[in-house]
Amino acid sequence: MTANLPAAPMLYREFSTQAQIDAQYNPSIALADPAAPGKHFVAQSALARASLKQHLDIPFGATVHETLDIFPADAPNAPVFVFIHGGYWRALTSKEFSGVALGLQRRGITTVVVNYALCPWVTIDEITRQVRAAVAWTVRNIAQYGGDPARFSVGGHSAGGHLTAMCLQTDWARDYGLAPDPIKAALCISGIYDIAPLRYSYLQPMIQLDDGVVRRNSPAYTARACATPTWFTWGGAETSEFARQAQSMHAAWGALGNQSELRPIAGADHFTVLAGFERPEGELCAWLAGQLGV
C-alpha cells in the first residue's frame, strides 16, 4: 500500500512550485517567438526618434543611469506624460520605449521616458527612489521643454506599472516640496503590486528580494489617500495572476476612497497591450487625452 504523502507546502497562494509561479509571471513563456516583442519595440522606438522632436539623455540625478528622453508636443504648454518602462527591474532602458511617444505626440501630449539603474547592481528600493526623483525633476523642469506641470500624468508597464503605483504612494510635499498630489492621472499597465511571488520565481537571483524589500515595495499593501485618478489595466490575454494583481491594487485603492478604473485591454497579451500608445486613437492614448483635457 502506498502511503499518503503530505501535500507540498505553498510558496505563494495556491502555487507550490517555481514552475507554477514562472508560468504565471514569465510572459515570454507562451510566445511562439519570445524575441518578437523586443524587435517590435526597438523598431517603433527608432521610428519615434527619427520622426519626432526630442531631447535625449537629460540627467535628473547624480548617476549615469538617471536620465530622461523628452519628446515635446508641437504646441507650447502641452500636457505631460511620464512613462516608466518595464523589464522586471533588471532589463531594458528608455531607448526601447521611445515608441510610446508616437501616438501621444499626435494627441498634443509631451512624453517623457525615464531611464533608471537596474537590478542586481541596485535594489528595487533604489530604483523606486530614482523614479520618484525623475517625476519630481520633471514637475519642476518640464516647462523648459514646453510642458505644463499643472497637467501632469505618470504611467508605466509591468515593472513600470509597479513603479507608477509606488509613485502614487509618495508624500510629495514632505519628501520633495511639491504639491501633495502633483500627478493628475496615472496609468498602471500590467503591473505587479504584491511582489512577494517573484521571490520564488526565475527572477530572484537578479532582483534579490527579501522580506524588507517586499514589504516596502508592494503598493497593494501601502496605499494612501490620493487625489490622482488611476486606471489599472492589463492585457485580456494575460495570465490570471496579472489580472488578480490589478484587481487587488484597484480594491486597495478604492478602499481609501481613491478614484480608479479596473478594465483590461481586450485581446492583448503582456506586450501587445502597449500598442495603445502607437496610434493617437489607441485606447491608452485616448484615456490619457481625456484625463488631461486634450
Language model segments and positions:
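Alpha/beta-hydrolase superfamily serine-hydrolase fold, recognizing
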Residues: 2-294
